[in-house]
């Protein structure tokens, strides 16, 4: 119970910095040079990239609003892998935990003028105890295109949102997690890692995202 209260408290503390992270990410993009080998398909009318000198709060609201109101794609999410870090768990626990997160989700997304990814999503999947766990939120990824094939992309960023779990009585819990991806054309393999302590947390979770 103490651990749960601690995690909830930490989540509540970290959630307010999410808009700052979004603003910081956009600021980095605005001051960095373009390294792509060829143009990418982005939203040329993206209002977020056109506005300078905005507050971090306004920039964050614009990012969310643009993603919601002017998405470039609608996405299907398919949870694929849950893996409990064997170096941080007793075998008796991992033997009985579920690692097949059956479920599905839906979202909208866009690429900004820098070719970086913004998305809003909601998913539901079977958790470690084989109970339904919903999660929804916002994701941002800085995108790199290391080859001449611009459809092949690598991403690194964060996701912020809210989840609810059966073993926490489905109390809404804010989350702030790292996000990474490998993408080709309309298909992305995205993943996050949930940090924790011994026998708690330390879970790798990944899903497929298909643009429709």
From Swiss-Prot:
Listed GO biological process terms: lipid A biosynthetic process
Region span, Disordered: 36-56
Stretch forming the signal peptide: 1-24
Active site: 84, 127-128
Cross-referenced Gene3D superfamilies: 2.40.160.20
Alphabetical list of InterPro entries matching this protein: LipidA_acyl_PagP, OMP/PagP_b-brl
Site (Role in lipopolysaccharide recognition): 93
UniProt main location, coarse: membrane
Catalytic reaction annotation: a lipid A + a 1,2-diacyl-sn-glycero-3-phosphocholine = a hepta-acyl lipid A + a 2-acyl-sn-glycero-3-phosphocholine; a lipid IVA + a 1,2-diacyl-sn-glycero-3-phosphocholine = a lipid IVB + a 2-acyl-sn-glycero-3-phosphocholine; a lipid IIA + a 1,2-diacyl-sn-glycero-3-phosphocholine = a lipid IIB + a 2-acyl-sn-glycero-3-phosphocholine
Alphabetized UniProt keyword annotations: Acyltransferase, Cell outer membrane, Membrane, Signal, Transferase
GO CC list: cell outer membrane
SUPFAM superfamilies, sorted: OMPA-like
GO molecular function annotation: acyltransferase activity
Transmembrane segments: none
Keyword Nucleus tagged: no
Matching HAMAP family: PagP_transferase (MF_00837)
Family: Belongs to the lipid A palmitoyltransferase family.
UniProt subunit comment: Homodimer.
Function, in words: Transfers a fatty acid residue from the sn-1 position of a phospholipid to the N-linked hydroxyfatty acid chain on the proximal unit of lipid A or its precursors.
Identification of the protein by name: Lipid A acyltransferase PagP
């Amino acid at each position: 119970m103490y651990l749960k209260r601690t995690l909830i408290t930490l989540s509540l503390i970290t959630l307010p910095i999410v808009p700052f992270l979004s603003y910081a990410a956009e600021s980095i993009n605005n001051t960095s040079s373009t390294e792509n080998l060829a143009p990418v398909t982005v939203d040329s009318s993206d209002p977020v990239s056109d506005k300078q000198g905005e507050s971090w709060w306004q920039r964050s609201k614009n990012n969310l609003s643009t993603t919601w109101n002017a998405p470039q794609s609608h996405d299907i999410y398919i949870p694929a892998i849950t893996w409990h870090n064997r170096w941080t768990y007793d075998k008796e626990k991992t033997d009985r935990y579920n690692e097949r997160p059956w479920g599905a989700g839906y979202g909208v997304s866009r690429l900004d003028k820098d070719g970086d990814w913004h998305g809003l999503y909601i998913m539901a999947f079977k958790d470690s105890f084989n109970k339904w766990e919903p999660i929804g939120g916002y994701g941002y990824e800085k995108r790199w295109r290391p080859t001449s094939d611009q459809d092949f992309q690598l991403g690194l960023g964060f996701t912020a949102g809210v989840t609810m779990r059966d073993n926490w009585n489905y109390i809404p819990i804010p989350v702030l997690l790292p996000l990474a991806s490998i993408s080709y054309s309309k298909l992305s393999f995205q993943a996050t890692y949930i940090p924790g302590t011994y026998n708690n947390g330390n879970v790798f979770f990944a899903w497929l995202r298909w643009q429709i």
